[in-house]
Amino acid sequence: MTEFQGKIELDIRDSEPDWGPYAAPTAPENSPNVLYLVWDDTGIATWDCFGGLVEMPAMTRVAERGVRLTQFHTTALCSPTRASLLTGRNATTVGMATIEEFTDGFPNCNGRIPADTALLSEVLNERGYNTYCVGKWHLTPLEECSMASTKRHWPTSRGFERFYGFMGGETDQWYPDLVYDNHPVNPPGTPEDGYHLSKDIADKTIEFIRDAKVIVPDKPWFSYVCPGAGHAPHHVFKEWADKYAGKFDMGYERYREIALEKQKSMGLVPPDTELSPINPYLDVKGPQGEPWPLQDTVRPWDSLNDEEKRLFSRMAEVFAGFLSYTDAQIGRILDYLEESGQLDNTIIVVISDNGASGEGGPNGSVNEGKFFNGYIDTVEESMKLFDHLGGPETYNHYPIGWAMAFNTPYKLYKRYASHEGGIADSAIISWPNGIAAHGEVRDNYVNVSDITPTVYDLMNVTPPETVKGIPQNPLDGVSFKAALADPAADTGKTTQFYTMLGTRGIWHDGWFANTVHAATPAGWSHFDQDRWEVYHIAKDRSQCHDLAGEQPEKLEELKALWFSEAAKYNGLPLADLNLMETLTRFRPYLVGERNSYVYYPDCADVGIGAAAEIRGRSFAVLADVTVDTTGAEGVLFKQGGAHGGHVLFIQDGRLHYVYNFLGERQQLVSSAGPIPLGRHLLGVRYERKGTVANSHTPLGDLTLYFDHNPVG
C-alpha cells in the first residue's frame, strides 16, 4: 500500500482526499488473459495432434495457433503436477510430493502449499486480474475439505475469486460431488436431462468470464480449467463412444506401432526412436523377492480371447469418446473467446498432468475403486456391464495395455517418475498476440515447474518478493520464453529431479538415470537396494538401451546428483507404502479419534476426511425415526454409493441394510416384519469377527434392531 498523499485538516471541506492507497490493483493496459487447461491421465500418444488416434479438434486448434512441446514433463501424479504448475516450483518444495490422500506430515509431503510459494492466481489477483478455478482442484488436504474445517487451502483462499468444481482427485461425471465457491451444491441436472460434468465446467468457465466482462470489458482474467477427463470414471454419452466403434480393434500393441509412425512423421520424436517393451520389468523382483505387481502388467493382445478383445476395445472406445466429448466442450470456450474478441490476447497453456493411467489393471475395470482395494477385475464380471460401459452404472477404466499404448513409445505409466511413460506428457502453449510461432514444435526439455516462470516472462512480470505481505521463496522453474521464439535457443535448464511413490529419476544435460522400483501400492521399501539404470535420453527417448554397464561413472555421477537435488528440494523421505500402511498411518483429522457421531437431516454431505470411520471395525448406526404411515420409505444413513458403500433405509414399511462391496456384490439384511407406527430407534449393528483368509477384508455378524430388539 502506498502512503496517503492527501491533506487532512480539521474540516473535511478544507482537506484533500487521496484514493491511491485504497484502490484495488489495476492490471497494465492490454495485459493478456491467461487460460491454463489441465487434462487428467492423458498419455502423450492419445490426441491426434500428438500422433494418437483420438480426435481432438479443439486441441488441434490451439496447436495450430501455437507451439507443441515434445519433451514436456510432469511429476507422474496429479496433485504434485498441479501444485508445481501453479507455483513454478518443484512439487516437493511446496509440500506436495504425492496426492493429497497419501500425504504424510513431512516438509516434502504435507499437502499444504505454503504461503511463501504463492500460486499464479495469488500473484495475478494482486496485479488486478479476475481469477477463476473451474473443475478439479485436488490441492486441499482430506482433513480440510469439510464444512467445519479451515478453508485456508480452498481455491477461494489461494487467489481464486470464484470456484466451481470438485475438491478431490476424481468424481462421477454424471453425479459429481460439486462445490461452488466454499459450499457443496447439487449438479444442475441429471444424465437423463443431458447433464455431464464436462459441459457444466465449460458453461461455468464462460459464465465466470462473461459475468465480469459485461462490467469491466478491459479487465484481464486468469482461468484455471481442469476437466475430469481422462481420469476414471470414463463417463460419456453412448453416441460419443460409438463414434470410435471398431477403431481400436487392432489392439494396443498395433496402436503403438501406428502412433510411433505418426509421431515420427509429425516430427514429435527422432526418426530412430524405438518402441519400448510392453512389460519391461516382468522378471524384476523386489528386495525381498516380491514379484513385479500383477496390476502393473500388460496382457499381450494375441493372448486374449475374442470376448476379451471385444471388451478391451470397447473400453478404449469409451475413453476416446470421453476425451472427444470434453474436447468439444473446451471448443465452446474457445468459440466464446473468439466471438468476444479475446482469443488472440489470451495465453493458453494446455497440459496433461501425468502419463496415461494403469489403474485399470490387466483386465480393465467396471469400478476403478477395485484397484485401490487391491482387487483385479475379471472379464466375466465386466462383461455383465458391457452395454453400460461409460454410463452411470459403471465407474470404468480401460486395461493397462491401453495406458502403455497411449504413452507410446515410452515405458510404464502414471505413478512412475522413473520412466517417461509416467512423466512425458502433451503440452501446448499459444498466444497469437505474443508468440509468433504457429503450428510448430519445440524439442527443449521442459518441466511443469517451468510453465509459470515462462508465463511470467511472457507477461513481463517479475515474480514478486512478497505476496499478501509474505516474503516469497525463489521459483525453481526456468523460463523457456526464448525457445518459443527460436527453436535453437538455450533455455539454461540443465537438471531436473523426480520422485514419486518410491520411484526416482534425474535428468541432466541429455542423460537420465532412474531406479527400477515398483510404485505404491507395492510397498517394496529397501530403497538402498534399488537397481539403477542410465540412458542417454537425448538419443534414446524411450529408454530402450540401459548404459549402466557401459557408463558406470555416468551412473554414479547422476545418482549423486539425485541426492544433491533431493537435499535442495525436500526430496526425502521416500515413500512407497502399501494400502494397509497408508490406511493405518495417523492423519490430523479434525474429528479426532471419536467413537460417536450425530448427523442431522438436511445438512451438507460429509466427506471421507470428516465422516465416521467404519472400515475394518465393529460399528452401529442408530436412527431416531417417527413412522407415521404404513409403507413408509426413505434413506436413514448412507456412506458411498452405487460403486461401493453401505446404506440403512426403509422400504415398504420394513427396515433394510445393504452392504455394497465395490459395486460387485450386495449383501441385504431386512427386518422380519414392518416397522410399527410411531417413534422408534431403528438401527444396525456390525460385530467384526475376523478377516477373510489371506486378506485384510473383515468378516462379521450384522443385526437389525427396532428399539434395541433384534429383528433381522
Regions found by a protein language model. Give the residues of each.
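Formylglycine-dependent sulfatase
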Residues: M1-D528, W532, R541-A560, S596-A604, ...
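Short aromatic-centered micro-motifs
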Residues: L178, I506, L648, L704-Y705
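Core structural elements
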Residues: C226-H231, L583-E593
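Hydrophobic residues embedded in beta-strands of well-ordered beta-sheets
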Residues: R504, F512, G653-H656, L702
